[in-house]
Amino acid sequence: MIVHIPAVLNAEQIARCRAVMQTGDWIDGRVTAGHQSRLVKNNLQLPESSPEHQELGEMIVRALWHNPLFISAVLPHTIFPPLFNRYDVGMGFGTHVDTAVRRNLDGSLRIRTDVSATLFLAGPEDYDGGELTIEDTYGTHSVRLPAGDLIIYPADSLHFVSPVTRGSRIASFFWIQSLIRDKTQRNLLFNLDTAIMRLTEDVAGNPALVSLQGVYHNLLRQWAEI
């Protein structure tokens, strides 16, 4: 399930991210890549230990926990502290699958990566190329979103970033351990929750809505891993 979540960050927050990232000390992005990914990764990252990384990461996580669409689609258990990357002209990231388990720099946090996420901090007008292409059972999907928008997709998906041909592509990327490990179950719950919200707008007060909400929460209770 690939979901586009618009306007996770507002204009002021995007401007703050860009200002802070302009003064950051960028390093080779391969420092966070697995053995296989290291062979195809060519970008820059903010060091995880930098104050810029901590400030911006905390801002993004707060925004995510207050975003209803993100909560509904992901059902997050733990959000990995966001990382930040930059692709300049000629840089890209070949086809790969994200590492199944991620740990932070000091080893105090370890998560199962159920969902991958990219939060765009530069818009399509800022660069050419740099499309994020995700492969699933229905084919390939190429994504270039406005600054502040988020794309989420199953972490077991093959994906790649095309080389940038103009400008710089800056983004935050991170992973989420969901309450629901199985992506099929997670998708069913998201579709059910979406239908309930639409029915609430159209036929508020209908007793059947209470039954549907009960089905949703009982499935969540049965499948959730706390």
From Swiss-Prot:
InterPro entries: Oxoglu/Fe-dep_dioxygenase_dom, PKHD_C, PKHD_hydroxylase, Pro_4_hyd_alph, Pro_4_hyd_alph_FE2OG_OXY
EC number: 1.14.11.-
Residues at which Fe cation binds: 96, 98, 159
One of the GO BP terms on file: intracellular iron ion homeostasis
One of the Pfam families matching this protein, by short name: PKHD_C
Location of the Fe2OG dioxygenase domain: 78-178
Stretches of the chain forming a coiled coil according to its record: none
Protein name: PKHD-type hydroxylase Bind_0236
Species this protein is from: Beijerinckia indica subsp. indica (strain ATCC 9039 / DSM 1715 / NCIMB 8712)
